[in-house]
Amino acid sequence: MDESSSTTGGTDTESGADDTTTTRPDPTWTELPGIEDLPQEVQDELLALVRITEELRGLVFIEAPIISIVTDAELEARVRALIEEESADFPADDALYKLLGLLDEEVVLETLLTDLYGEQVAGFYDGETGELVVPMRSGGFSVVEKSTMIHELTHSLTDQQFDFDSVMESMFDEERLDQASAYQGLVEGDATFTELLYLQGLSQRELGEFFAEASDVDSTTLNSSPQFIRDSLIFPYDAGLEFAQSLYRAGDWKAVNDAYSIMPGLPGSTEQVITPSDYQRDLPIEVLAETITLSGYDLERQSVWGEFGFRVMLDQVLGEATGLVAADGWGGDTYFQWFDGDNAAFLLLYEGDTERDLEEMKDALVDYARTAVADEDFVWVEVFDNQLAFIAADEVPVGETIRSAMQG
């Protein structure tokens, strides 16, 4: 990925951006902080990648990005540390996924995700510090490492311009999880699209080097992970890329830029990322329900499962053909997740776009319950008042309590 190929497949720096994003606030900075100890040719290469990112993305950095160059081992250690910061949520999610038959009993979710991200993350952007953390082997950046740098620089650039990190952090803090997943699809899709534009400008030799290097990446943990874990990891990059490209085709970079402020207020949903034509058109139904108190259990979470949530659970257990048909009619939902330190309980209330959609989801969840939920656990699927209720619990009396509360 050399500088000479940077403009191929890119856009004019005025494209889709207003005056505040195309005029550099400080046009004089020519050095990047934190890389003074690197060889001069590497410093020059990093600065060139910054300028390439600006040109491809049609935006400019408000201030110089902070770049930390680490070894592969240091990168993995930092990724593992980030995963461990979220460790408080893992036991409850581990129990829920096992109750739903998505995770084998011998698998420890925290260990799986720590190993998976340690294996798969090639670099990351830390929104709290504004820092890019990327690896470099001796002798400079490889083709894949340059591509990764473009991706992470795009995150830094768009966060400076649109403050996406604080928006997404608020969504997670407020348990707006499907909305956060959709917004993450925009963020990762944007960066992946910019990275793709960069790759399109490479020579055949450089592309050969890229694919050869990419094929050597160890994916042992990814390949052995449950399908719903793999799909969840890939979603913001894969579906997000299609979403970002759809926005770009409709309105150039301006449409992508505008989505950063539009999606939080819609609200956005994974349905809109999966089907970009639904963006700003098919808004989620707000499904309301009274909170149920379960003796000995804490309410771990109330949120929205979302179309993507239904897709990954149904795809793994019943196959993608069933998952696609059943989840495509998603109108809205709400779910409650309880945990007592060992056992999980789950209530999911779903509304379809049409009565037929509701029946299709009911049929799918009945099959799912028979196939995935253990015989000794409680599971119940029923439609009432145009809502579909799916209840599962490790302890049968707890499941009965939830059902009784739903039946009034």
What are these regions (language model features)?
Residues 159-211:
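Post-HExxH zinc-binding segment in Zn-dependent metallohydrolases
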Residues 62-83, 171-175, 209-220, 263-264:
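Acidic helix-start/capping segments at beta-turn-to-alpha-helix junctions
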Residues 1-23:
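Ser/Thr-rich, Pro/Gly/Ala-heavy low-complexity intrinsically disordered linkers and tails
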Residues 43-134, 138-142:
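Auxiliary, metal-adjacent structural segments of Zn-dependent hydrolase domains
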Residues 132-150, 179-182:
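Short pre-active-site segment immediately N-terminal to the catalytic Zn-binding motif
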Residues 331, 339-408:
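C-terminal soluble interaction/assembly domains
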Residues 53, 147-164, 191-192, 244, ...:
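Active-site recognition of the HExxH zinc-binding catalytic motif
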Residues 220-343, 349:
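Pan-zinc metallopeptidase signature
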